[in-house]
Structures are given as C-alpha cells and as structure tokens.
C-alpha cells in the first residue's frame, strides 16, 4: 500500500534526523561547555571506556570490524549485570558516528558471522540487556544490520484501531515488558502471577527470543499468516545459533501459537471442560503453557495502554489454572468441577443465611439450577442472584433485571431472570445496542424449569462502566421491551465514519473440538467488522435458523469483532453438517446486507 510505504519512510527519516540532531547537539555541548579530555574517564575493558556516563571506544577504528559493534552492547549488558559503579546512559557522539559509518559499509547481515552470533546470543540470553543495551540497539537500528527480517519492520505501521505502535516498537516493548514485570515490584495480582510463572521458566532466553520473533513476519503479504512465517524464521534463527533442537522446537512452537491463548480465553467458553481439554491437548505440557502465558500477556500489554484490563486478567487466570489442571490430570480424566461448585455454594449459602434467608428455601431454588451456573458464577454473584430471585414473584410476568459492578472490575454486570421465550436473547441485545451499550461478554443459561439466567458484562461507548444515570432508564427500557414482545426491535445507531474506512472479510468458522458433539454442543466463531447492531443481527440469524445459544464470548479488537458462540439446534443437539452449511450461508448473507446498509 502506498500509505504504508510513505509512513515507513517517514518513520525511518524522522528516526535518522533525531539521531543526527542528538549527535550534533552533543558535539556542540563538547565544544561550548567542556573539553573532551576533561571528562571523567573509566576504562571498561581493552576496547571500551566511559566518558562521564557515555560509552566510547578506545580505538576509533575498532568498528572496521563490524562485529565489534555487538561487543559494545555486550559490554553495556555486562556492566548492568555487575551493578558496577560505572554508570552508562548512552553512547558517546563520536562513537555513534563511527557506528553509523560501519553500518553503511557493512556487506550482508552480521548474523552470517559466527563471532557475531556468539555475541548476540550472549546479549539476548542475559535479561540485563533489557536495562539499557537492547534499548540502545533498538534506538540505533542495530537489529537491522543483524537480522535479515528486521529492516522491513522498522517504521511499519499497523493500520487498525488496535495497535498503537509500529511493529519494531511493539516487539521491543514486548521484550521490555517481560523484563520490567519480572524484575520489579508487582503492582497487581496479574503481574504477580506473571512473575511467579516467569521465575519457574527453565530458560528465560527462550522467552525473549520468542518475543523477538512473534511478529517478525508481519507485512510480507504473501498469503501466509505471520505466525506461520515467523515460526519458520524462529526455527532458522535457533538452528543458526546452534540452540539445542528441543529449544528450537519450543521457540518455533511459541511463535506459531502466540495468538492461541488469547483466542481461547476471549472467544470461547473456558468454563466448558471440552474447550479446556482441547486447549490442553494443544499446549501438551506445563512448560509450553508457562512460556505461552508469559508471551501472550507481554504481547497484549505492549499493544496499547488500555488493552490489558481486569476483565481479561480474570479470563487469562481462569484459563491458565484450568489448563494446568487438565494437563496434570491427563487426557483420560475430565476436569473435576465438583469442588468449585461446592465452594461457591457454601460461600453464597453462608451470606444468604446471614441475611435471614432459610437454608431450605435456598436449596429448593438451587435444585432448578444447572451445575454450569455454579461453575461460572462466584459465591458473591450466586448470593446476589439468589437473594433477589427468592424475593421475586414469577407470577407477575415482570422480568427480574439486576445491575451491579462486574466482579472483574471492568464493566457493569447485567443479570436477567425471566421465563424463556423464542427470540428473547435477540430482543435483549437489540435493546442494549440501540442505546449505545457495548457487550463484552454474555453468559446464556436456562434453569431446569425454563427460566433464563443470562448475565452480560456491559460498558458504554468510552469503554467505562455504566453510570447510575444510565442504568435507571436502561432498566426501565429493558423491562418494557421484554414485557411488550409485540413491539418491533429498535434499530441500531449508524456505523461511524472511522469504522467505514476498514474492510474486513466476514468469516464463519465451526471449530473442531474433540468430544463437543457428544455433549450436544457446536462451537462457532464469527469474525467480521465491528459495528453497531452486529450482535443483534447475529442473534436474529440464530433465531431464524432455530439455533439455541448456550454461551457467547464477545471479543472486539479495534475495528474487528471475533465473537464465539456455543450453540445447539432446536432439539438440543450438535449441528449436523447440513445445519452448519445453512447457518453459515444465512449468516454471511446477513452480514453482507449489513455492510451494504452502512
């Protein structure tokens, strides 16, 4: 794309200008305010010194052998490791000039030199390189003369509403996040979990190499997914640097699957044992799980400043520990949720009895609740729901509509309890989206006596929890809309201009999850352009095709929606091939019509 080429050139030129400006200003300071020889001199080794807090060469011609460029950064790394009294904050301007000259004269890439490979491996294998050495290597484009893939990444923008940084900057920030969280005080539980897992990794260097290569193949436009291309590059790199074959395979696997953890956590029903077991079979063992968790979290946190939130933290934590349990039990054993059910029931029952509600009434009500309800909801949520349901009179035919703060701190939780009827989910969703409400997650469930027990996590247009001023009228609108079923569904707000700039091909994909059909469930993912009314449209197609929604996971990445659904046909069975084909056709046609309307 011309705009991509323009922006890449723009970033490249601005970086060079910034580099030259910094170098020239430093020379001016030398000439005006001080003398070159008056600076405090510290000898690092036989090749490098520091002038005050800037590293310099002893011999200005040393970079005639370009491998010595890497030795410069290895010296910085080793000083950081030793916590030396010699402090370095940057590179002396004449040294920068000599590096620039050596780069221009270089033929080929440094990784072709076995001496350079040995030095680079020492740098990336030492986490202390992330304190300063890698920052300076990134700043002065050293990776562009080492890795053949790197020059194409420098300044490459990702034209979406998700990625804030260029590809090279994002990769550097991913590596920096790994170091920062693992070596600093934890600010929250998610960072503490990351730190605990990181500390148990057998080789930290493999995580840094995986981070270096996870997006290295972006922008090649050759029809293959960047994860597939990158895994090949990672394997070639590891073999070239003579890593053990087991390490080569692990790094290549991590790059290939670096999106799988987030896809599973955000798009699929992670409380379904079949889903967890299928994911555990992909992961294979605890080592792969630990590496993948750390890489995924670092990748997300290095994407933009708002992507990692407490809602995603909770999902990732749940998937991590569920998968860990599945791996330890082995494929022949299903995950035992009985203790989770017991703990949540006991916690809720204690609070209900404390509130003066008789235990017999509670247990009588709970007989109508399925096990999945007690797995998916915490003790506090079960208490909140049960307390209100016991005070509710179903004979009035007025739905029970409750609002509260989400247990994950992100969003407002909406709980609806009422007698089920055809199209009720579509009606709920249509009302919400017509008021500009975004749905982060939907848990659809029926009791044994045919009452819906649907939970939604909602945010406003700015991604914030709903204010009290919005909740009160929304509650009234939901009540009226669910009671007056003859009223037509509200129309969604038009697609904003910023979304109209994006073209995303709609895809309806049925997942092949082993054992899912036997449980009467089919898993489907729908990827398309995010737009107002999308979820309402999807649910209306399900209704038209007589499909029941058992669970929904709504994942929005910038302008892209990747929604996952657990569904069954009107007989409560998994969809046949014929039913899948019919649903796919109807869904794609409906999405195409929505595109034309916008």
Regions found by a protein language model. Give the residues of each.
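Short acidic (Asp/Glu) and glycine-rich catalytic loops that position anionic groups and cofactors
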Residues: 1, 51-56, 96-102, 111-117, ...
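A glycine- and charged-residue-rich anion-binding loop/surface
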Residues: 118-119, 126, 163-166, 170-173, ...
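Short, glycine/acidic-rich hinge or "gate" loops at secondary-structure transitions
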Residues: 32-35, 188-193, 244-253, 449
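Conserved catalytic alpha/beta cores of large enzymes that bind or transform nucleotide phosphates
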Residues: 106-117, 186, 238, 244-248, ...
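Regulatory modules associated with amino-acid/nitrogen control
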Residues: 2-59, 132, 140, 278-598
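Active-site-adjacent "gating/activation" loops or surface patches in catalytic cores
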Residues: 42-56, 139-159, 165-216, 220-221, ...
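Divalent metal-dependent catalytic cores for phosphoryl transfer on phosphate-bearing substrates
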Residues: 1-3, 9-13, 19, 166-167, ...
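Non-catalytic interface/linker regions that flank or bridge core catalytic/transmembrane domains
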Residues: 1-163
